[in-house]
Amino acid sequence: MKDRLIIVSPRQYGYQTDYLKYVEYLSEKYRVVFICLNQGEKKFECDKAEIKYLKLAGKRSSYLWFMIYTFVYITFHSGKVMTTNFSGCRYLKKILPWRKMVVNIRTVSVYKDSSKAAAQNERIRKDALGFDRIIMISKGGAEQLKLPMKKVDIVGLGADVISDTPKTYDSLRLLYVGTMNHRDIPKTIRGFHQYLLASDDSEATYDIIGDGDEFQEIRDYVTANNLSNRIIIHGRKRYNELKPYFDKCNIGVAFVPINEAYRHQPPTKTYEYINSGLYAIATRNQVHEETVHKDSGILINDTTEEFCDALKKIRQTKIDDTLVRNGGIPYLWRTIVMDELATSLEKI
C-alpha cells in the first residue's frame, strides 16, 4: 500500500500546471489526495488521484469551509501534507503541529508597488516559517524572502514536450500562454504590430492564450488597428487544450517586466516553449539569463522596440528546432518532480 500524500490548494485542480504534473508523477510513489475549491471551472478527469472539490459559496464562507474541511481531513487521515502558499496557510501547521507538513512557494510578490510587494513577501515569509520544510522555486527567491535556507529545498519549474511537430521559421507564428496580470503583454502586441508594418512577413500571426487585467486593453488595440486576422485572442485554455497552438506556432513569448519582483521568477511556459521547438523571446531576468541560450532563444529588455527588433533578428537567423529542443532537456517535468520534489517530501 502506498503512503498517502495530501495536497492542499484553494485553486481548483487542473488550472495550475505545476500541480497537474505533481499529481501525474507523484502518483507513482504516493496515494495522492488533492483538496481544492470548486471555482466553477470545467473539472479535469483524473484517475491518478482522489480530487476533493469543495463547493464555492461566498468568499469568506468558502475559505472558512475549506479550512475546516482540510483540518478535519488531515486530523483523521495519515500521510504527508503539502500545501500551496495561500494567505493563512500557516494555521494548518499551527492547529495541527504534530503533522509533518511542507509549504510550496511558487512565486514571490509581483506587485509593482514596492510597499505592497514588501508587505506580501513578509506575509509569505511568516506563513512559511512554521512548516517543517519549505519548497521554493529558486534560491534567489528564497533569499529575497529571507527564508532559513536549512529548511529550504529548491524545486524549479518543469515542462513537457507538448508538441513534437517539426518547426520551420520562415514566417513567424508567435504564441503567448499565461496570465495577463502585471506582465506588460500590450508591449508585445505593439511590438508585433510594428514588425508587421516594417516586414514582408505576410503570414505572421500572434496567438494569445490567457486572461487578466490586460486582456481588455489588448482586445481594444487589436480591434482599433484591424489586427484580428493577425493577432488571435483565445482567452483561457486548459493545459490539455494547448497542443494545437504549440503545433502551429514556432516562437514562444516569455515576456515579464524586468524588475525586482520578477528577477528570480521564470514564466512557467518558457521551458514548454523550448521543449516543443518554439524559439523563445525572453526578457532579460536572472533566471532567463541562466536558461535561455542562443540556440533556444533571444534575450531582450522589456520594451516594445526591443520586442520588434527581436522579431526582425529572428527572421534573419538560421534556427534549428532540434537545438531549440535540446535546451529544454534539463527541465522535463519527470526530472523535476521525481528528482527534486520527491526528494524534498522524503525529508518530512
Q: Locations of the language-model features?
A:
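Nucleotide-activated donor-binding/catalytic signature segment of Leloir-type glycosyltransferases, i.e.
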Residues: 219-243
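A short, active-site helix/loop in glycosyltransferases that binds the activated sugar's phosphate group
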Residues: 38, 91-92, 122-152, 159-161, ...
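A charged, aromatic-enriched C-terminal amphipathic alpha-helix characteristic of glycosyltransferases
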Residues: 302, 315-348
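Membrane-proximal helix-turn-helix segments that form the acceptor-binding/catalytic region
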Residues: 24, 67-76, 103, 115-136
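Nucleotide-sugar-dependent
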Residues: 13, 183, 240-242, 254-272, ...
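Conserved acidic donor-binding segment of nucleotide-sugar-dependent glycosyltransferases
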Residues: 294-305, 312-318
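Short His-centered aromatic/hydrophobic patch
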Residues: 82-88, 105-106
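Conserved donor-binding/catalytic core segment of Leloir-type glycosyltransferases
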Residues: 5-8, 135, 165-196, 207
